[in-house]
Regions:
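N-terminal Rossmann-like dinucleotide-binding module
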Residues: 1-65
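Short acidic low-complexity segments
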Residues: 69-81
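Predominantly a Rossmann-like dinucleotide-binding segment in NAD(P)-dependent oxidoreductases
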Residues: 142-240, 373
Length: 383
């Protein structure tokens, strides 16, 4: 077996997602399983180079996980010819410039979304990457959730007949930070720092809708700030200038209507933190992070509206759980594996910087729709 060491500059791994999902659950998990077998006698061995601004935090991570390489100097890391891939999980406002430098240095790019703070910047990154001839990918983790993989299986199997509509509910109560610490970083709630639920979640909804149901043709959204003041990591009050909730209606190719509510100011009365209900002529499904329930046309009850008597049906009990039928790996790790196969075995991979730009576009148009109070068409973008 030929073991090939792959050095990956990982910028932003001291943050919640960068650390938990990308470093621990993806790259270190790949090392724990002995590397990634490409199937041709080559096993890829990922060697992370932890990059960030705070040396003490990087050192603590390296010691905790027995890793050798850390750096607070991105330029030096990018100048190192042994580093193949640049990964970015920084705050959005710092991402664009860093990715440009990495492309100029000839590194393959794998990045969190949103790829840039605006569509022009996102398209420029895609163009630069294409012209440089490098491989590039954008994290689209929701597609790899067990619940959505089951939903895709239902779609591919023709379960729904003609799909009519999609309803999504996402969110939970993020504490304000005064009497209980907030479970999300304070920059998420400051527009000037790249915060806001639209720029965070609409890129996710773009690829979920696009991949499963059809391209988004129009958006009509209301974005608002329900909680105008929050308290930061040091217990200091600050003005929440970014939107913390967004209510969107999306028209898709083929006439499917999607309606998705996203909120950090909602209390959860559903089985999971995100749920999508899909209704079709032949059946319906409700998919979350892990689970998926269905109701077929032949088993659909026939309720009659009568407010004078208690409900005779326990409606939730009339849905059937979709079995796993397979083992599901961590979604971030699954996508890392696909990207590494793309880079080193030329395997197909279409979640690239152009796909990332579509997500930025939808967020931008969603905010424009909210500001102008109107429905906005979503034009197709190309390089």
């Amino acid at each position: 077996v030929n073991r090939k060491t792959v050095r990956i500059a990982m910028n932003g791994v001291t943050g919640r997602m960068g650390y938990r999902q990308h470093l621990v659950r993806s790259i270190l998990a790949l090392r724990e399983q002995g590397g990634l077998d490409l199937g041709d006698g080559t096993v890829l061995w990922p060697e992370p180079v932890l990059v960030g601004r705070r040396e003490h935090a990087l050192r603590a991570l390296a010691e905790r996980h027995d890793l050798e390489h850390i750096s607070t100097d991105v330029d030096t890391v990018l100048a190192d010819p042994t580093v193949d891939i640049y990964f970015d999980a920084q705050v959005t406002s710092a991402r664009e410039e860093a990715i440009k430098k990495a492309i100029a240095a000839g590194k393959h790019i794998y990045t969190e979304k949103p790829t840039a703070t605006g569509l022009e910047g996102a398209l420029e990154l895609a163009r630069l990457a294409q012209n440089a001839g490098i491989k590039h990918g954008v994290v689209q983790d929701k597609l790899f959730l067990p619940g959505l993989l089951k939903l895709k299986r239902l779609i591919d199997g023709g379960f729904f007949g003609r799909i009519l509509s999609v309803r999504g509910e996402f969110g939970y109560w993020v504490f304000e930070g005064d009497w209980q610490p907030a479970q999300r970083p304070s920059w998420n709630y400051r527009a000037e720092d790249g915060g806001g639920i639209v720029v965070d979640m609409f890129p996710h909804w773009e690829y979920v809708l696009h991949e499963l149901f059809g391209r988004v043709r129009s958006v009509q959204a209301v974005a608002t700030t329900h909680i105008p003041q929050r308290w930061d990591e040091n217990g200091k009050p600050y003005d929440a200038t970014a939107d913390d909730a967004a209510y969107g209606i999306f028209e898709l190719d083929g006439g499917v209507i999607a309606q998705i509510n996203s909120s950090w100011a909602v209390r959860v009365n559903r089985d999971e933190l995100v749920e999508f209900q899909v209704d079709g002529t032949e059946g319906s499904a409700v998919a979350g992070l892990r689970n998926c329930r269905v109701q077929h046309r032949s088993a659909t009850p026939k309720p009659v509206w009568n407010p004078d008597i208690p409900a005779t049906y326990a409606f939730r009990d009339q849905w059937q759980e979709v079995p796993d039928n397979t083992e599901f790996d961590n979604g971030f790790k699954a996508q890392w594996e696909l990207f590494l196969r793309h880079v080193y075995a030329d395997a197909p991979y279409h979640w690239d910087l152009l796909a990332g730009a579509r997500g930025v576009q939808l967020a931008e148009l969603g905010l424009q729709s909210s500001t102008e109070g109107r429905r906005i068409d979503v034009p197709e973008i190309a390089l």
